[in-house]
């Protein structure tokens, strides 16, 4: 089954994608990851992408779609895939439709995790990190001692892009990019919207119910 996974920052997309990978044995394909892998491996498309990345510019769609096409042709995608973080625009969605047609792997379903902005802001702006790799949340999982890591005793901190203003900006960008795509895939009868405010396992049970018809 071939899946596109949508959801704003903080909606739990990564968590649900991991559960789908474990449950169905199909790979999660994150554009950021495969882009970095191609650059690291020095592939022709990776080198083309690196030229733009080194200048701090966005990688053009035609380079990105070539990298995605090559990844989807790999053996582990035979039974399906989860596309995470792509497409982000209507032109990208159109380009994706063309390559999926070429390799005969049409999208079965587009899962859209929906969470109200206020909850997303609380989820993300409450995150705390430590340099040792430990992570906390002011409300849901605070360190035992204020601002001190339970594991190494180091000072915990908030990442710059997790601050409330930055989160609001990220959500605005996401909405501008993704709302047209919600409409695009709704018209094709592919979109299923799920309530991302529910418990992680509850959300996954709903995903499994949706995917049952494609498994």
UniProtKB/Swiss-Prot annotation:
GO terms for biological process: AMP salvage. InterPro entries: Adenyl_kin_sub, Adenylat/UMP-CMP_kin, Adenylat_kinase_CS, Adenylate_kinase_lid-dom, P-loop_NTPase. One of its GO terms (cellular component) is cytoplasm. It comes from the Archaea. GO terms for molecular function: adenylate kinase activity; ATP binding; zinc ion binding. Residues 126-162 are annotated as: LID. It is found in: Cytoplasm. Pathway: Purine metabolism; AMP biosynthesis via salvage pathway; AMP from ADP: step 1/1. Its main location: cytoplasm. Residues 30-59 are annotated as: NMP. Monomer. Belongs to the adenylate kinase family. This is Adenylate kinase.
